[in-house]
UniProtKB/Swiss-Prot annotation:
One of its GO terms (biological process) is viral process. The keyword Transferase applies. The lineage of its organism: Viruses, Riboviria, Orthornavirae, Duplornaviricota, Resentoviricetes. The keyword Cytoplasm does not apply. It comes from the Viruses. This is Protein VP3.
Amino acid sequence: MKVLALRHSVAQVYADTQTYLHDDSKDEYENAFLISNLTTHNILYLNYSLKTLKILNKSGIAAVEVQSPDELFALIRCNFTYDYENNIVYLHDYSYYTNNEIRTDQHWITKTDIIDYLLPGWKLTYVGYNGKNTRGHYNFSFICQNAATDDDIIIEYIYSNELDFQNFLLRKIKERMTTSLPIARLSNRVFRDKLFPSIVNIHKKVINVGPRNESMFTFLNFPTIKQFSNGAYIVKHTIKLKQEKWLGKRVSQFDIGQYKNMLNVVTTIYYYYNLYYSKPIIYMLGSAPSYWIYDIKQYSDFTFETWDPLDTPYSTTHHKELFFDKDVNKLKDNSVLYIDIRTDRGNMDWKEWRKIVEQQTVSNLNIAYKYLSTGKAKVCCVKLTAMDLELPITAKLLHHPTTEVRSEFYAILDVWDIITIKRFIPKGVFYAFINNVTTENVFIQPPFKLKTSPTDYIVALYALSNDFNSRQDVINLINKQKQSLITVRINNTFKDEPKVNFKNIYDWTFLPTDFELKDSIITSYDGCLGIFGLSISLSSKPTGNNHLFIINGTDKYDKLDQYANHMGISRRSHQIRFSESATSYSGYIFRDLSNNNFNLIGTNVENSVSGHVYNALIYYRYNYAFDLKRWIYLHSIGKVAVEGGRYYEHAPIELIYACRSAKEFAILQDDLTVLRYANEIEGYINKVYSITYADDPNYFIGIKFNSIPYEYDVKIPHLTLGVLFISDNMIHDVITALKKMKTELFKMEISTSYTYMLSDNTYVANASGVLSTYFKLYNMFYRNHITFGQSRMFIPHITLSFSNKRTVRIESIKLRINSIYLRKIKGETVFDMSE
């Protein structure tokens, strides 16, 4: 959903668009709530309130002020991520395809021959980091840039087994045009760039678990963040390989040698970060022209010093000369060295060239060892070739994708590797490594152990759900880690599957009830964005690839109506009720009937079940941005801080009724996941509330009326406003509560319109207009530890006779209250009050 705020209405009609006029009779929160539950994708918000826009954005719903028709057209035609703190819109708009254009935010690609393999008549455009270079296209009142690129297609091609790039590109563009936008992937980079600076500013020690290549630039500015990944492929792992021969396989039609070099250097930088927590000087031997240096410098400021007879235009300092063994003493401490020296074959005989390459490999290793043998804080990445060779058993082997699989690979060495044991590796084993292993991640740090780290802030995005982790260990980590942001895959199945297949792995699934947390927020991607200053125009869809975002140790926990709140809680319900269901009242009717309340007159205004909890349960796949457990807990301890809106405090029994309705809904839908979730939420409610039931009552509150429009044979027909189980010394507390509620009690607009047999030999009249006051009275008694109400649903009725009678229907008549009293069952009246 996107909310576009306008001062004036527009004449043009847009598809899937609805207009909302600010209601001045309601406050900003109530207007925001009403907007959030509208069912169209685009909301044109007229006569808007800035406070309402802020509320929506903090809830993760993109709400932007629009000042011109051009701005409106730009935002209504595509989805976007909005940095509402800095007023920056990041469009995810692929309409540039209509210019016969694909886009990249990686400069090195523009220096390759990729243009020869594009679709006929198409071009490649460099748009800068997250599309920053496109800002000049939009002369808007807010900062706007188009972050959409085709780098995902290019990178997927590089790692695929396909060679024909044009066919691959064509298929992927067609897929993009016929499937829903992967909005979370597109906005994730914006999110990471917003998230980590804010965390590092607050927390000195930060752990990041499971980063992938898409984050390779994000963390360049954060050397102090400790990374954990899947570990490195080291020399001693080659013992499992059987010898093979040269393969000579083409990987890419266009030249990706620069991409390989960039990955090698970035891998080395992150390896250095995890050892020394600071930025190194980067020395490079060979690898000209290294256009990719420009890409790295767009993200972070590094000093590059390079040696190569050819130009390296983006290097900080370039020596247009060869580098020799004797030059090693020119290299300073606190640095990384990338050795990419190899003579081009040209027209040379392959045997002669092979001999030179092997000599250069030995020379490269000698330079590496000499560099690492003196000084401090050094890491080296060195180019090697498949040959009989001795290497340290702890050396890290790299084989990032390159244009052709031939005989080259790389090794990362640190100061400890050069003093460890070396192992002889035959040429055939290195070929086996080259032919069968592709390094898929620039992060080669050790795997994360599922243990708490009291002094660290742990970030684990999309990293811990894999079934090679113990599910219980993941739960324990989340329960016990004081400060963290961790995601787990939400259980979107209908059969309550404990794990699901995703790509080539299995992931555990989770529900919010799997965790026992306090001072933590459990929300969706959208809800998490709102907490960190972002909002999004396309909410998460229940695709099966959805995650719970669990934030431990946040100062936003008590701000119940500002973050991870109830915005949009009824949206899915509205979509169903106003399009597919038997009546728009279907939800109200079902909730009452499933709790054996058969008086449906006015069910939409006087419902006996919490609609919030009911919708949060049955449609949890659509509205799990709302942190239901937090909402319940803060209510249970009386610490609900509400800024605005039409606030209604639910009685705990209303929440229980909602769970019962949700369970019946789940049974009818054969939804085992909702069934378990509702059962566990009901258990949680009973855990945090101290609910007691007057199932064996000794007192009741009665209401006597001036007159009753039915025949009766009881002595005094009355409405039982609830039963109590109290000791005699609590009578005073009950009377005090009734006196406090006197005005509200006598203001009740009670009406009746029919009679019915409540049970065998119990003839009663219905009573409407009672429930909201009953639940307020329930809350007052609950807070004073007075047992009030039974475990079955309270059905307001007026007892007329204890014999069988014919039912009667009349026009609804308002009843005037004569008195309200407290009486002992089968005893005397102990308190009576009149208006």
